[in-house]
Amino acid sequence: IRGFAIGEDIVTSPRAIYDIEIKPADTGVAVNARVSNETAHRLQSRRRSMAGPSGCGLCGIESIEQVTRDIAPLQSQALPSQVALDKALTDMRARQVVSQSTSGAHAAVWCDMEGNIVSVREDVGRHNALDKLIGWRSLNPTDGFVLVSSRASYEMVAKAAPAGDGG
């Protein structure tokens, strides 16, 4: 929830989420997040007409204006070396535990600048895997870069940028 809210620019900081409550429901789980009035207004203006999407970053939007959003430019930072990228790519598959057992999960990983994998988040939906990683990063800010096991679409880049994950 935290990563989705940050990646979708619903909140500008993890501190804007006061409380998260998860309850069993008839057909799954219900998640309630307590946020400020300003955040609630932002959420209402970005409302989508579907619950629990597992994939498409544009699915469920109600108007074309919701496709683009203002994204603050990231501060200039060093890029990972080719050696670091090669190391992370080589090591990523071995760290994808869910994918190894199901052959049906995407991964988003956080790597340090040397290409060492620091965190792995997996999900059937590539956007969800990235949301999970963004949520983890909001609690564990470190230098590094994101690597995903699937294509990095416009929506995924736009999701990672507000979290400061431009590397």
For each predicted feature, which ranges?
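A conserved acidic, glycine/proline-rich C-terminal tail/linker
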Residues: A163-G167
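Glycine- and Gly-Pro-enriched alpha-helical subdomains that act as flexible
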Residues: V98-S150, P162
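Intrinsically disordered, low-complexity regions enriched in acidic/Ser/Thr/Pro/Gln residues
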Residues: I1-A108, M113, S119-V120
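Acidic, divalent-metal-coordinating active-site segment for phosphoryl/phosphodiester hydrolysis
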Residues: S153-V157
